[in-house]
Amino acid sequence: MEGGLRSPLNRAVRMAKYLLDSCIGMLPYPKQRCESFNVVDLLSTCSFYKAVSLKNLKLHIEQHPSFANPSLSHISKFAFTELPFHAFTFSIPKMSLDKQESPIPIVSNDKNIGIFESQNSSPNLSSHESTLDGNNMHTVSSEGSGAYAEHGPGIDHKIPQELEIQSKPDLLWSRVRHTMREPFSEFFGVFILILFGDGVVAQVVLSSGERGSYQSISWGWGIGVMLGVYASGVSGAHINPAVTFANCIFRKFPWRKFPIYMLAQVLGAMCASGVVYANYKSAIDMFEGGNNIRTVGLNTSSAGIFCTYPAPFMTKTGQFFSEFVASTILMFCIYALQDNGNLGSGNLTPLGLFFVIFGIGACFGWETGYAINLARDFGPRLMSYFLGYGHEVWSAGNYYFWVPMVAPFIGCLFGGWLYDVFIFTGESPINTPWMGLKRLMPGGLGSKKVDSKV
């Protein structure tokens, strides 16, 4: 008898599941209300009302006082004229005949659910392990685990999940954007940074101080960094290869992302410097003394608009140390602003970085121009070479060009190391045995326990 019922019962279950999915799919979740929804009648029409005891059909309605403890005698008829669809759940734990788990999806609004998108629900899931979201997407949950979506943990399940979890895009460009949005974010973050930074230098230099002063340059770079951080929040707003490198070392940022981040940052700087050049081309021609005259190192040279050049009295050691100190300050302050265990800055981090950059420029910018960023210096320098400034962009300052490419990496590493050693108590290689050196020496010192019997 039981075996004979199994095949019709399975067909009935599939039909019921299809009808349930259809009914749910017709709702433009979560705004539209369901005028009436008769669960028992729907099950009975699918020929397996007898197979499921009414006592096993549990209706749990959350966040609504009038349905907090519904009576089983009134379970067959109720109206949702006041109730949002996402506020109720129902479940059928098990089938009494074949003792198999119910394939009907269980809707759950538990707050600590790990979300992993899947097109097919697992057939061997127990109660509260299979979920159905607003897009009829079956999702598998693991009770107690963190909530994960496209950007990792942290879904607030008080918000309808359809607003938090985006399904895989169908359009070609949407798929490209979905995959490349972090590099795009870094590109435009640096683009905004250089657009404001080189723009303010161009205005001050080409107007011979009539439309700004040195402090204007500090303000412009600070604003550029602040707005660049706002524009590139999706990717973490590094906008500096040295910052990305330090995060790979101290904050477990994936090394596989470092090359594409660095490339996007350099390209963003190149494109922005090209826009600044196009905008000020007429003023550059007038300042240089004629059309297409481009010089480096003279009083009427405009090359300093795009990249940094050291003061004539600076030695090679002084050049390097100046960039090293400024980069160390930058990285130390970035980690301080991000550390919630310290005072932290939260959503005011971009504003805090504005003051950091303004302070570095106002106090440490005269000698070398405080590049503190490979992308900020190398990208515009390369663009200026292509625009006709010649090989002098590389040889000026006793071949200074390599200093703002190397010193920021060493300075940012040292700044991050200083903060983690003396202040930071969170997850960092510094806060592991041998300050992280043990990880770099598999089988080396301290990696194996010494047998006391030997």
Swiss-Prot record:
Catalyses which reaction(s): H2O(in) = H2O(out); glycerol(in) = glycerol(out)
Residue ranges annotated as motif NPA 1: 240-242
Glycan attachment points: 299
InterPro entries (alphabetical): Aquaporin-like (IPR023271), MIP (IPR000425), MIP/Aquaporin (IPR050363), MIP_CS (IPR022357)
Induction: Expression is higher in vegetative hyphae than in conidia and infection structures.
Annotated motif NPA 2, positions: 373-375
Record topological domains on the Cytoplasmic side: 1-186, 238-257, 338-351, 425-454
Chain ranges passing through the membrane: 187-207, 217-237, 258-278, 317-337, 352-372, 404-424
Cellular component GO terms, alphabetical: plasma membrane
Signal sequence range: none
GO molecular-function terms, A-Z: glycerol channel activity; water channel activity
Keywords for this protein: Glycoprotein, Membrane, Repeat, Transmembrane, Transmembrane helix, Transport
Phenotype when the gene is knocked out: Leads 28% reduction in the vegetative growth rate but does not affect conidiation. Also leads to significantly reduced lesion development on tomato leaves.
Protein origin, superkingdom: Eukaryota
Pfam families named among the record's database cross-references: MIP
Membrane topology: Multi-pass membrane protein
Transcription regulation keyword on record: no
Parts of the chain on the Extracellular side: 208-216, 279-316, 373-403
Purpose: Water channel required to facilitate the transport of water across membranes. May play a role in the vegetative growth and pathogenicity.
Family of the protein in this entry: Belongs to the MIP/aquaporin (TC 1.A.8) family.
Name the record gives this protein: Aquaglyceroporin-9
Organism: Botryotinia fuckeliana (strain B05.10)
